[in-house]
């Protein structure tokens, strides 16, 4: 044979996803993967990973930047905010009142870094220091006030369909149900509830927290999520930049699979080849 598999050139098709944009509060993004800035071993790793991910939204913990917490000194200046949209978050806030104050600081921080029209805030109200599970009541209270103040609120919540709908009704720009506890790497443990949220939401659904590897990112997107926010799985990987690239590819793959529509799950096999003309089968009578 002149042509063998070993000699053949294989090309991986790169899908054109430019028309499939993510829109949040009237602003459009090409990438459906958001990343964070925490837990990296160095700023160099962080910058390389964010670049490899192709993300356009990066979340920043306002309190840690404001207080120059260890590992966050100079963080605000470490990235090119002309190319990346900042998503200030209220991590570290245990009450609605704290989260509202920190959200206001985050908006001012974004303005100082050149994003004058940035009203985005990732809302986190977490009084639980062990499991880092969000407070649904405090989150709703803070969201109501921040929406009144003109914020585009992206609330981090348990995968609670009723809470997600209530937050949508008060004017939140997205809902962000957790896949499993923050940093746990347990993957998607709330699949049924996330499906319900996706089916009923009229705002983007962003799965946030718990994703540990690329297959779980693809799984979340296959459920119909509009986007993902992934930090620990990238930052704490042995090779963060490579994991960031894997997560980016998985996000695209999962999105395409959701749009394509998977086959139904059946209890019995269905042959993919014709059942006529089998060896040993009698010819049809003419």
From Swiss-Prot:
One GO BP on record is: thiamine diphosphate biosynthetic process
Signal listed as a keyword: no
Q: Name one GO molecular function term.
A: thiazole synthase activity
What catalytic reaction does the record list?
A: [ThiS sulfur-carrier protein]-C-terminal-Gly-aminoethanethioate + 2-iminoacetate + 1-deoxy-D-xylulose 5-phosphate = [ThiS sulfur-carrier protein]-C-terminal Gly-Gly + 2-[(2R,5Z)-2-carboxy-4-methylthiazol-5(2H)-ylidene]ethyl phosphate + 2 H2O + H(+)
Task: Identify the residues that bind 1-deoxy-D-xylulose 5-phosphate.
Answer: 183, 209-210, 231-232
- Report the principal subcellular site: cytoplasm
For this protein, the Enzyme Commission number is: 2.8.1.10
**InterPro entries the record matches:** Aldolase_TIM, Thiazole_synthase_ThiG, ThiG
GO annotation, cellular component aspect: cytoplasm
The cross-references to Pfam families, in alphabetical order and at most eight, read: ThiG
Instruction: List the transmembrane segments.
Output: none
> What are the record keywords, sorted?
Cytoplasm, Schiff base, Thiamine biosynthesis, Transferase
**Pathway noted in the entry:** Cofactor biosynthesis; thiamine diphosphate biosynthesis
Subunit relationships: Homotetramer. Forms heterodimers with either ThiH or ThiS.
HAMAP family the record matches: ThiG
Similarity field: Belongs to the ThiG family.
Name under which the protein is recorded: Thiazole synthase
Classification from the root reads: Bacteria, Bacillati, Cyanobacteriota, Cyanophyceae, Synechococcales
């Amino acid at each position: 044979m002149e042509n063998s598999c070993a000699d053949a050139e294989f090309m991986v098709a790169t899908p054109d996803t430019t028309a499939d944009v993510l829109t949040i509060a009237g602003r459009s993004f090409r990438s459906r993967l958001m990343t964070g800035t925490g837990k990296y071993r160095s700023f160099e790793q962080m910058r390389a990973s964010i670049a490899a991910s192709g993300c356009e939204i990066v979340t920043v913990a306002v309190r840690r930047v404001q207080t120059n917490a260890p590992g966050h000194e100079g963080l605000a200046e470490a990235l090119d905010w002309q190319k990346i949209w900042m998503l200030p978050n209220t991590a570290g806030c245990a009450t609605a009142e704290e989260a509202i104050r920190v959200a206001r600081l985050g908006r001012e921080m974004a303005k100082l870094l050149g994003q004058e029209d940035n009203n985005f805030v990732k809302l986190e109200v977490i009084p639980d220091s062990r499991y880092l599970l969000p407070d649904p009541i405090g989150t709703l209270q803070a969201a109501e006030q921040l929406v009144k103040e003109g914020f585009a609120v992206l609330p981090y919540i348990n995968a609670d369909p009723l809470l997600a709908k209530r937050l949508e009704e008060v004017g939140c720009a997205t809902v962000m149900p957790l896949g499993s506890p923050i940093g746990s790497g347990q993957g998607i443990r709330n699949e049924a509830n996330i499906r319900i949220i996706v089916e009923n939401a009229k705002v983007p659904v962003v799965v946030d927290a718990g994703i540990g590897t690329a297959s779980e990112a693809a799984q979340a997107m296959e459920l119909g999520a509009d986007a993902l926010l992934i930090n620990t799985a990238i930052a704490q990987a042995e090779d963060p930049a490579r994991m960031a690239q894997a997560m980016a590819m998985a996000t695209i793959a999962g999105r395409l699979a959701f749009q394509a529509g998977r086959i139904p799950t059946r209890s019995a096999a269905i042959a993919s080849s014709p059942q006529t003309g089998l060896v040993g089968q009698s010819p049809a009578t003419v």
